[in-house]
């Protein structure tokens, strides 16, 4: 339905002063001669003719004038989600009270839904309560804004811009819709970096074996849960979600390790991998040490750039939305999401670091080298004590299919 409410204007407001000038130019009507009897005058009985301004004012106040048309238009605006009668503009779109409350509840509680059909259920006035997954999907598709729920009521005609709080307390000052996208990426983090553990934030601290394994599990959990919460990823086919995470989990792990300044001391890593428990050949020791060195180098190079929280979120989204994953059902859509993430990073860097013109390029150049860290080595170093020979790809698939990473059956995350 075409929206004309916001553009309709009162005729008196269209040309200010035009109608008043017409009234002032009308010739004066002579009064009755002195001594003539006073008789009330009514229209059509010799009284002064109505001026255009008076006529317009009278028609607007009448029951059939444009003023009543405006009220009727406002009363007949439909909810863009279900087609019910809209109660106004909520979170960026005209919606009914039911869809407004559903969207607010879903976003504030960070609820996750599952569709029992093919993720294409009809959402109308009579079926809107049958599938919460498809209802929330349609809310987002028509343009309802998650960030508007987090920040409270927003002016209906103002674009989403201003400051968005980062996890490290820095303000995000971007003036476009991409800043809202970054804000959603940040809010998708299941918990802030500081909750990875106090040992993680102390570079000179040598962590014990159990702490290393627990921290690694938290970072893997964080990567999967973050992906489940970011925009557009839950809308992909579950097979595409699994394919993307199975390919990129090790790169996301390295980014998380750099973000939380994970201590990477050789001796505890070798102990966590169980390599002290059995004798190894010299060649195997050298090869393993090389892999640890590569891991350390990638983490240190990222730390040297002083990457902030928003940049890490964009980098992880660029890594995740890769068309290199096998068997994707919609390669073009995944590529568009990667491009969106890259544009968001570029705009953010240009806005926040205007004196570092090469920063955006340096950040992007770090991504290809993340794949030099072998995923099998990460498994051997951090996860063999927890899950034995169970492949990480199997854990990721199980976490996605179970609907929540909080319930993965391999260890208890506090």
UniProtKB/Swiss-Prot annotation:
SUPFAM superfamilies, per the entry: Glucocorticoid receptor-like (DNA-binding domain), Nuclear receptor ligand-binding domain
All residue ranges annotated as the NR LBD domain in the record: 177-403
Region (Interaction with ZFPM2): 117-414
Segments of skewed composition (Low complexity): 38-54
InterPro entries from the UniProt entry: NHR-like_dom_sf, Nucl_hrmn_rcpt_lig-bd, Nuclear_hormone_rcpt_NR2, Nuclear_hrmn_rcpt, Znf_hrmn_rcpt, Znf_NHR/GATA
PROSITE patterns cross-referenced by the UniProt entry: NR_LBD, NUCLEAR_REC_DBD_1, NUCLEAR_REC_DBD_2
GO cellular component, as recorded: cytosol; nucleoplasm; nucleus
Biological processes per GO annotation: anterior/posterior pattern specification; blood vessel morphogenesis; cell differentiation; female gonad development; fertilization; forebrain development; in utero embryonic development; interneuron migration
Record text on subunit structure and interactions: Interacts with SQSTM1. Binds DNA as a dimer; homodimer or heterodimer with NR2F6. Interacts with NCOA1, NCOA2, NCOA3 and PPARGC1A. Interacts with ZFPM2.
Family membership: Belongs to the nuclear hormone receptor family. NR2 subfamily.
Protein name: COUP transcription factor 2
